[in-house]
Each structure stands twice: as C-alpha cells, then as structure tokens.
C-alpha cells in the first residue's frame, strides 16, 4: 500500500510497509534526491502513517532562467505532480526535514471534512507524545510559483501589460545548500495545485535571524492555486507567510 515511483534508471522505488505504517528512507526522497516524476501517496487503513526519514522535495529547484528553459519549465503543471489521497497522514522526524513544491510542480492534496490530510511530526503521529503547543518538531511546507514579487523589477502595470526587466528567481526563506528553492516570475495566473481540508502542525525552523520555515510558506503562488479549508496549528514563527503572488484563501484557521 506504500507510495512508489520509477526513477530515471528504470528502478521501482517504494516505501516499506511494516504492517501499519509506510516508511520511506532518504533513498526514496530527500534533499538532493528530489521527486522528479508524478507521485501519489495513498490513504492507509487502521491509522497508518507515511513516515519520511528525509525531506520531500517535488521537482527541481531551478536557480535561473537558463535552467528553467533547459527543463521546459515555464508554469505550474510542467513539472511533476504530488497527489495525496484524502485521509492520508504524513510525518517527519525533525525540523531539518520539510516539504518543497518547486516552481512548475504541483501538489493536489484534497481531503474532506471527515478525512482531512495531515502533515505533522513523527513525535505526534507515531509516538503520540507531542504537546499541544509544541513547535519545531519538523520543518513545514514551502510552495513556490511564478507569481509577481516586489523583489523583482517590472515595466507596465500588474494585471495589464506587466513585463519583467530581468530574471526573477528569488531564494525562498528557511533553507540553504541542497534545501534551497526559488520563486517568482510574472505569472499571477500560475497554479501550484490544490490544498483542501489540509492540516499542518508542529512545524518550524530558524536558519538565521529573520529567515525561518513556517507552517506553510507561499512564494509567488498564483491565483489558479486553490486553497480551501486549511488549518495550521502550533507553528514556529508564522502559520502561513506570503511572499508575493496572487493566491486566494477560502476558510483558513491558524492556531
């Protein structure tokens, strides 16, 4: 019942099922071992949890226009898609591990009122020992897109004849080295996917003063990304933090 994919060498890479939970080593996904093909994470029966030892980065972090062009990435949907089934729970062991949806990639995490999708820490989901207000138990989420940012230079008017003067590839907060990712562009209509009935809790990390991982960081995320019924609970720094873009929210609770 565990998630699997076929890597570039033709090998089938799959999580290990222990009878209840699915466990994924860094050989499945981690910083420097990004997911570069479509991946579906199923719901597990009997309270099963998807436990990741490494970070889950979807798509590649292209730092400049030449890299984006070589990869054929110009908008959301050009890269791999992460699909998470309703009722699934995903967990990570510490706050050096987190989730990135890179520009061009998309996440479709669509839960229901009775079966939400949960992103949390193993201390919460597996050990059951997380305090209600504990933070920094795992990193959190970063979702990037090609939306407009005031950190880039444009001509014209937003929503009319806007055009970039130069490249727009902004390093996202909360990461360095292999953990780095980038956001920004001139496409406020970009789509990074859909989050609905999603819970994110016990997150956060500080890389430097004023440079943190939040519950979810949205970098240049466009308005065609659908976000509805989102709950972010017990997070270090901010529940959500917006860096440019034009995404809208319907029903958000931050506790």
Question: Residue spans of the language-model regions?
Answer:
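Beta-strand/loop edge motif enriched in small/polar residues
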Residues: 1-255
């Amino acid at each position: 019942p565990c998630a699997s994919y076929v890597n570039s060498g033709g090998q089938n890479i799959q999580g290990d099922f222990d009878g209840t939970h699915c466990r994924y080593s860094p050989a499945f996904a981690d910083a420097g071992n990004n997911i570069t093909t479509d991946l579906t994470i199923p719901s597990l029966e009997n309270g099963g949890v998807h436990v990741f030892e490494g970070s889950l980065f979807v798509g590649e972090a292209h730092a400049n226009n030449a890299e984006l062009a070589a990869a054929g990435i110009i908008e959301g949907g050009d890269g791999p898609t992460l699909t998470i089934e309703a009722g699934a729970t995903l967990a990570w062991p510490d706050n050096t591990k987190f989730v990135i949806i890179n520009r061009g990639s998309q996440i479709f995490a669509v839960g229901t009122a009775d079966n939400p999708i949960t992103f949390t820490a193993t201390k919460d989901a597996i050990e059951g020992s997380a305090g209600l207000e504990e933070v920094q138990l795992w990193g959190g989420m970063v979702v990037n897109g090609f939306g407009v940012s005031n950190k880039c230079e444009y001509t014209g008017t937003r929503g009319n004849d806007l055009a970039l003067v130069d490249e727009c590839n902004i390093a996202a907060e909360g990461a360095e080295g292999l953990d780095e990712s980038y956001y920004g562009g001139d496409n406020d209509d970009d789509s990074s996917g859909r989050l609905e009935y999603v819970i994110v809790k016990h997150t956060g990390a500080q890389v430097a003063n004023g440079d943190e991982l939040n519950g979810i960081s949205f970098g240049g995320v466009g308005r065609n990304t659908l976000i509805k019924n989102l709950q972010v609970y017990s997070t270090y720094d901010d529940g959500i933090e917006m860096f440019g873009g034009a995404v809208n929210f319907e029903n958000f609770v931050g506790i």
